Amino acid sequence: MNQSVTREQRDGICILSLNRPDKLNAIDATMISDLNHALAVTLDCPDDRVILLRGEGRAFCSGNDLEASEAQAACGIARADVQTHADALQAISRKLMLGDKPVVGAIHGWAVGAGFEWALNCDLTVWGRCSRAFFPELGLGLFPTGGVLSLLPRVVGLARTREMILLGEKYDAQTLQSLGLANRVVPDEQVMETALSVAGQ
């Protein structure tokens, strides 16, 4: 069975790839566990100087795996399990933001919900020109994690943060760049090449 997160070392750059392309890299419990582990290993590895986070297939990350969530809900979920899930998501954000190695995000296709949060947790991001991102959580009866409620107001202001979270509107890469949420916007086919170049600096 394929790992939901793969790890590749290349000249001091550790490439972490979300690897559920058939699900547009939707986040399930296995991916959360695998990414937490991969980040811990990478942060502890002296050969890795920079982390590059990307997604396999047609999207960076389409957010929570709703099919998996619905299946869990049908079986009944204990409050403690919900808290464990949220804590594990927060642990990823802490590693991305507070780890001692810079993180470059290579974002293409969709970055949705927690996937958008992970993109915003990166120190530098390269977005494909056709990329789109949004927060659907409130419409699904959920709430954003990943520290975005602390991060976003500092960058885009309180009014825009409220719009992004409460309305769940979709943003293109150029708009995100104008808001200070994307460093570089390049043709889709140049995302990985550009991200590697940035990471190599």
Predicted feature locations:
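Crotonase-fold acyl-CoA enzyme core
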Residues: 94-201
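Conserved CoA-thioester-binding segment of acyl-CoA-metabolizing enzymes
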Residues: 1-56, 94
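Hydrophobic alpha-helical membrane-association signature
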Residues: 31-34, 85-88, 191
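A short, glycine- and basic residue-enriched loop/turn
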Residues: 21-24, 58, 63, 130-132, ...
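Glycine- (often His-adjacent) and acidic-residue-rich active-site loop
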Residues: 55-95, 111, 141
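Terminal peptide-recognition signature
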Residues: 16, 20, 34-35, 53, ...
